[in-house]
Amino acid sequence: GFTNISLDLMYGLPTQTPDDLQRSVHEAFALAPEHISVYGLIVEEGTPFAAAEAAGRLALPSEDAAEEMYDWLMAELPARGYARYEISNFARAGYESRHNLGYWRNVPYLGVGAAAHGYVGGVRWGNESNTRAYIRTMRAGGSVRIPEDTQHTRDNAMEEYAFLALRTAEGVDEEDFARTFGVEIDDVYRAVIQRYIALGLLRR
């Protein structure tokens, strides 16, 4: 059978209560997965959920209830042996997602197929999302890549490196930052770093 199973769970869903979430998570624990991801529902603009919310037809949990769910998850998952290694990801020792860590560490990856996304040479891109158009373009020898980094600059690359790394428990690898960009992180972000350390929001 499978020896490495990951489950994705969501909280803050319509009509969901903290008790509902706890029951779902305890059912997940009963399956003994090696990895669990938890995501809070975000109602994106232009979606059916956004339209339903605007019309008063979406019974989302209150802000207090959603916060209670989050706090419970952050305490319960580590208590059950799942270490938090990224904002939304928890794993038993040695079972951290290589895909997730690669993304947060800015490792290049290829996107293959319609609507796939890739990151190569410091540039992010997505493939044509319409399958018929994708196949037609490929058969004609054309490019299906659509660049996503319309303003790809060194400054943007450094910012992206930093904020992706800050999503992880390991944080920013200062030596790797210096190797990648040829400059010490303090020479670029010293004032920002000092400000957030003083606020208790960042530590070294």
Regions found by a protein language model. Name each.
Residues 25, 193-194:
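Short, hydrophobic-biased segments on the C-terminal half of alpha helices
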Residues 190:
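A cross-family detector of function-defining hotspots
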Residues 1-183:
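C-terminal scaffold of the Radical SAM
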Residues 197-204:
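A short, conserved structural fragment
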